[in-house]
């Protein structure tokens, strides 16, 4: 079983480390995504290029790589392997070896692995994100609010192990958004659709 668990973790990491935002913007001929806006490779920064279609595609593919890793691991290793694949995918997106361990902030992958493990929680995350984004126009705040609620939701609905996993992922997500949190506190955070 140890071998299966390691395989699930590695599989998740490899899936998660695929930098779709960077790949899509290069194919589209835009400037290097890491040199504009926040320098992040995720969908929010892709949106700052003005290419809404590319941003949507990045969001979708970043989420689906997490979902795919979870479902594949579940197929060969069960629920425990699926959760390890979720962890691996999240870490792979945050710290991809191909980009010198400088990746995205993990929101789309967070949604994707959540979708693969327990889809009602992913639905709740999306509703919370959309509601917060609609009222505040802050992508970062929307993600932080939704992620904060996710482990609580999982625990409440009888998934303590999964809740523990997502508590860890949420802490990592908050850490990756530490600069956004500072800007939110100072009132200098960019709103959705704004270019930096």
From Swiss-Prot:
Keywords: Cell inner membrane, Cell membrane, Lipid biosynthesis, Lipid metabolism, Membrane, Phospholipid biosynthesis, Phospholipid metabolism, Transferase, Transmembrane, Transmembrane helix. It is a multi-pass membrane protein. One of its GO terms (molecular function) is acyl-phosphate glycerol-3-phosphate acyltransferase activity. It comes from the Bacteria. It is found in: Cell inner membrane. The chain crosses the membrane at residues 4-24, 70-90, 111-131, 152-172. Pathway: Lipid metabolism; phospholipid metabolism. It holds the Pfam family G3P_acyltransf. Its main location: membrane. InterPro entries: G3P_acylTferase_PlsY. GO terms for cellular component: plasma membrane. Its EC number is 2.3.1.275. The keyword Cytoplasm does not apply. It catalyses: an acyl phosphate + sn-glycerol 3-phosphate = a 1-acyl-sn-glycero-3-phosphate + phosphate. The keyword GTP-binding does not apply. Belongs to the PlsY family. This is Glycerol-3-phosphate acyltransferase. It comes from Rhodopseudomonas palustris (strain BisB5). The lineage of its organism: Bacteria, Pseudomonadati, Pseudomonadota, Alphaproteobacteria, Hyphomicrobiales.
